[in-house]
Amino acid sequence: FWYPKFGPGQLWETLAADVQAQGAKLQFGHSVKRIVCEGGRVKAVVCDTPQGEQTLEGDIFISSMPVKDLVRGMDAAAPARIRELAAGLPYRDFVTVGLLVPRLGLKNETAMKTLGNIVPDCWIYVQDPRVKLGRIQIFNNWSPYMVKDPEHTVWIGLEYFCAEGDSFWNMPEEECTAFAVSELEKMGVVQKGDVLASHRERVKKAYPAYFDTYEHMDEIVSFLNGFENLYCVGRNGQHRYN
């Protein structure tokens, strides 16, 4: 995979700068609470903002928010069946634990040359039944510019698939990090004493899932397509992983 020099987030930073250069105004710290619909169109969104509740009107609305939240925000504008189907759409959340280490206990046995001769993978999927860990990210291979000293250290991300509010999601950060390190030790990837820094992130609705009410997704799409000025985009906006 090819990533921007400073990681995937740089794509959106560049996009934000470009649209602002064209006169767009970006509102941060706003949370959409209600979508006002009228005559087959979206008329406005009601938001919680640092200045209190505000109503923002527009001609065109592009939504990347989760479909279940979008439909819930429409309230009575959506038929009861559509609200029920959207509320039942499932998601998989995940926790990622980032670790900075001087080396990995994995050998680069390929012909690919890498900085520090680390393994060349962007991701490694974990199939070891002894651990909960699902995937290892190697950020050096996304872009070496994401790491301060890519020749002597490695930033890895450990992905755990879970559900918002479950025991793993709610685990204190220190305990979660210790658990992640112990799993890597079990697999011979790192040693506990090698960890130079760590960081834990929780990601809600990371993956839209294809079960429960998803089999009726076409009904939800048909309903949303009825709004001529509403465009649903992205993974959560379309409840579609790829």
Locations of regions flagged by a protein language model:
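Short beta-strand to alpha-helix junction loop
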Residues: 1-18, 27, 168-175
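A conserved beta-strand/loop element that lines the FAD pocket in flavoprotein oxidoreductases
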Residues: 19-33
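General small-molecule cofactor/ligand-binding pocket signal
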Residues: 25-27, 196-199, 231
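Mid-domain catalytic core of redox enzymes
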Residues: 30-189, 193, 201, 214-216, ...
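Short Gly/Pro-enriched loop/turn and capping motifs at secondary-structure junctions
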Residues: 163-165, 205-206, 238-239
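Short glycine/threonine-rich loop-to-helix capping motif typified by GTGT followed
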Residues: 205-214
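Active-site-adjacent bridging/hinge elements
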Residues: 224-232
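A conserved FAD-binding loop/helix module that cradles the flavin
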Residues: 234-242
